[in-house]
Design a protein with these regions (language model features):
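Portal/gating segments that form or line small-molecule/metal binding sites
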Residues: 1-55, 65-127
Length: 127
């Protein structure tokens, strides 16, 4: 997905340039095809749009042990919440946590985040 590249710039095999202004419709069409997975890497803007449109089947987040204090938002700012479940986590030697999440399709319930704490203070470790 790009607003600046030309189709001639794409040299990867089995790659297709999608104009940014039609990205959601193009992703819907690609998901309807037979074939492999679709991966998005490094585009917070596109990821945010796909999450808001419920077009994400899996979210792989790398959590760095660094606080930047700012940056691009990954999650939609549309006022609605999406519930994800942690499927797996791996800790790299550098301290980076690699977390795989999948949407549950469940609505956020009042007090939902409170369920993460058994005693109201310490987080419950997912099994």
């Amino acid at each position: 997905v790009s607003s600046t590249l030309d189709p001639a710039d794409i040299t990867w095999e089995n790659a297709e340039l999608i104009p940014a202004d039609g990205a959601l419709d193009a992703v819907r069409a690609l998901r309807a095809r037979d074939g492999g997975d679709l991966s998005i890497m490094g585009s917070a803007t596109l990821a945010r749009s796909l999450i808001a449109a419920d077009l994400v089947d899996e979210l792989n987040l790398m959590i760095e042990p660094v606080s930047l204090g700012g940056g691009k938002r990954l999650f939609p700012d549309d006022g609605s919440a999406r519930v994800f479940e942690l499927v797996s986590t791996t800790r790299a030697a550098t301290g980076v946590q690699i977390c795989k999440f999948r949407p549950t399709g469940e609505p956020l319930r009042p007090g939902h985040s409170d369920e993460l704490y058994e005693d109201g203070k310490e987080p419950v470790t997912p099994s």
